[in-house]
A protein has these predicted regions:
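Glycine-/proline-rich flexible loop or hinge segments
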Residues: 18-29, 59-70, 94-97
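Conserved pre-motif C helix in the palm subdomain of viral-like polymerases
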Residues: 65-95, 178-205
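Right-hand nucleic-acid polymerase module
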Residues: 77, 81, 173, 177-178, ...
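Reverse-transcriptase-like RNA-dependent polymerase core
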Residues: 42-64, 158-172
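Active-site-proximal segment of RNA-dependent polymerases
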Residues: 79-129, 133-139
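Non-catalytic, polymerase-adjacent accessory regions of viral genome-replication enzymes
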Residues: 1-42, 352, 358, 366-386
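Conserved polymerase palm-domain catalytic core
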Residues: 113-215, 219-237, 253, 323
């Protein structure tokens, strides 16, 4: 088998990559197809350090803390992306089918469908695991051991070791040398995330009746003794690998008890949008409502015209929700989103956030062409079964 870096250096491979992923990014395509890129690959194979210190930026607060994201320069980012792509293509076979994060042909939709269709799921206990700041706690030394035993390309192993040992970053103009082995923002990080618990995946497949992992979001089902054994084993693994539980998101649940997993709520075989997801939609719609009210005042638009514009905008984004229809199998969450949208249109029409907005009745919304997401959901389901 050719070296992975030999494949990346190949003109046809790079050309196919650019045509598939970089059609609207001429600058990156030019670099990937250039002689400079070929020289960078040569330097990597010679063990030279060509990755420059990324810039650390803090994102918005999440749970009272800032999230650290490392931003690499454009050329380094482009180089790391194509290497990550090649790694995922070549070494996807080493991962269990129960792992579905950052992998081609694996999705939340597939997992939820499997869970919802599992015979006896309503009688099973569930153990859900979440790691706190997963990337930040991955041990470079432990990951190196895993890489050595799973990757058969010496140049790739050498390069990945170099990445894990590279701790430099820049924050507020000053250079530091105490960064984590795995940096959020590095295109290789998803591969590292998947690889770090690869042995855990293999073991949990044997211990639980149902087991799935998305990076550090883990869910499994079985009998109560099975889940207790899985919880005990997970604690051992986390202690050994230096990982920390997110205690608020790690628990054993009774049969049919609601479990929040990613953006969903699972209650046995029932799958719905989570409260957090619906609240995120509420915040987004509220911001957009303020934008439409501002435009209405600025241009002196009529109530009806403003509502029509808002409706047109909302319905143009229905495709986002329709993509999620195959995942959920109840309309409770969809109905809540419908009410959020209806209230937003009423607010846009009346310029009132109070109960005064309800002078616009549902019949008026229908006359303007409003269609509920619930009706779109059932149309989708019926079309699927025709």
């Amino acid at each position: 088998m050719n070296s992975l870096f030999s494949d990346i250096s190949n003109f046809e491979y790079r050309n196919e990559y650019c045509n598939k992923y970089l059609l609207n990014d001429a600058e990156t395509s030019e670099y990937i197809m250039s002689h400079e890129f070929e020289k960078d690959i040569e330097f990597i194979c010679l063990g030279k350090q060509i990755i420059e210190a990324p810039i650390l930026k803090l994102s918005n607060k999440v749970g009272g803390r800032y999230r650290k994201i490392y931003h690499f320069n454009v050329q380094n980012l482009s180089l790391l992306k194509i290497i990550a792509h090649a790694l995922n293509e070549r070494y996807d076979y080493i991962f269990s089918d129960n792992l579905y994060s950052y992998r081609k042909n694996f999705s939340v939709k597939k997992v939820c469908k499997r869970i919802g269709n599992t015979k006896g799921i309503d009688d099973m206990y569930c153990y859900k695991v979440d790691a706190s700041s997963y990337d930040q706690h991955i041990s470079g030394d432990i990951l190196k051991t895993i890489i050595s035993s799973t990757i058969d390309d010496k140049n790739v192993v050498k390069f990945l070791f170099q990445i894990l040992d590279f701790k430099k970053y820049i924050y507020e103009g000053r250079e530091y040398n105490d960064g984590p082995a795995v940096m959020t923002g590095n295109p290789l990080t998803p591969f590292f995330d998947n690889l770090y618990l690869i042995d855990y995946d293999d073991e949990m497949r044997k211990k639980a009746k149902i087991y799935y992992r998305y990076s550090d979001d883990i869910i499994m089902y079985g009998t109560l003794p099975q889940m207790q054994e899985c919880a005990s084993y997970t604690k051992e693994v986390f202690n050994k690998k230096g990982l920390i539980f997110n205690e608020t998101k790690t628990n054993i649940y009774k049969p049919k008890e609601t479990v929040r997993y990613l953006s969903l709520e699972l209650s046995g075989s029932k799958i719905d949008f989570s409260k957090q997801y619906i609240n995120n939609i509420r915040r987004l719609v509220k911001r957009k409502t303020h934008s439409f009210l501002k435009i209405k005042r600025q241009y002196g638009l009529s109530d009806e015209l403003t509502m029509k514009c808002a409706l047109k905008f909302i319905e143009s984004n229905y495709g986002f929700f329709i993509k999620l229809f195959p995942i959920v199998n109840t309309t409770n969450g969809i109905a809540k989103i419908d009410r959020i949208i209806q209230d937003a249109i009423r607010t846009v029409g009346t310029s009132k956030f109070s109960n005064g907005r309800y002078r616009i009745k549902y019949g008026q919304l229908k006359k303007l062409g409003y269609k509920t997401l619930v009706s779109e959901y059932y149309s989708f389901k019926w079309a699927k079964h025709e």
